[in-house]
Regions:
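Generic beta-sheet signal
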Residues: 22-24, 100-104, 131, 190-198
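SF2 helicase motor core recognition
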Residues: 196-207
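Thiamine diphosphate
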Residues: 71, 75-78, 83-187
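Short secondary-structure boundary/capping segments
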Residues: 42, 149, 208-212
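Single conserved hydrophobic/aromatic residue that forms the stacking wall/gate
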Residues: 229-238
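Short beta-alpha connecting loops at secondary-structure transitions
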Residues: 139-142, 207-216
């Protein structure tokens, strides 16, 4: 999300509803805290508001709410609906001859929802080359291994069958992601799906590859420990 909001997307926190802004839809709405942190850092609302996550009468609900949170382009949570809305936004842009782009992030477990594939068929049929979808492919969902719940595999072949351009990357490598997004922007024949191979809980040893952390917050002690982790990145030209 940081790469999208700080490098790729045409957005203005001072004018969050600008007609020609790029749109972002977090189809895996349960990952809302990551979106909220990005929006706060970008300046859509004060960072102090992050401390009110999921509190009554505050703007940051458990899932993105476009009516209460500045910068949220679509309310999501019911899996599959976000990518469907993103398709509608992309088609509207085509009809209006607008040059904005639409980005959406899905979870791999979310791909078990049939609505996702209706949306994929729709986007491929209408050649929505202004739409880029990302799949967070870590192989885990709240109930465990995705292949043992309701396997959506093979993912690349499914998107290709609906006339999507498919790019696979290491989801923890910003350079690979940046290059993939630039490739998607240059592709004119239809939508692009960027499959990000990731590790759940990457960087935190006791969380890595553990499905149990899907919907569980760290304890106060664990939160303090996490705050001390420093991840350095080399300076990039973009």
């Amino acid at each position: 999300m940081a790469l999208l909001y700080y490098v790729e997307m045409n957005v203005d926190p001072a004018n969050p509803k600008a007609p020609n802004r790029d749109r972002f839809v977090l189809s895996k709405g349960h990952a809302a805290p990551a979106l909220y942190a990005t929006l706060a850092e970008k300046g859509y609302f004060p960072k102090e508001e992050l401390l009110n996550l999921r509190k009554i009468n505050h703007m940051l609900q458990g899932h993105p709410d476009m009516k209460h949170t500045p910068g949220v382009d679509m309310s999501t949570g019911s899996l599959g609906q976000g990518i469907s809305a993103a398709c509608g936004m992309a088609l509207a842009g085509k009809i209006d001859n607008a040059d904005y782009r639409v980005y959406s992030i899905l979870g791999d477990g979310e791909l078990e929802e049939g609505q996702v594939w209706e949306a994929a068929m729709f986007a491929g049929f209408y050649k929505l080359n202004n739409l880029t979808a990302f799949v967070d492919f870590n192989g885990l969902q709240i109930d465990g291994d995705i292949t043992k719940v309701l396997s959506p595999l093979p993912i690349p072949e499914k998107f290709k069958a609906f006339n999507w351009n498919v790019i696979e990357v290491n989801g923890h490598d910003l350079d690979e992601l940046h290059n993939a997004i630039e490739t998607a922007k240059a592709f004119t024949e239809g939508p692009t799906c960027i499959i990000m191979h990731t590790v759940k809980g990457k960087g935190v040893e006791e969380m890595e590859g553990q499905a149990g952390w899907h919907g569980k917050a760290p304890s106060e002690e664990q939160g303090v420990a996490l705050s001390l982790i420093h991840i350095s990145e080399p300076t990039r030209p973009y």
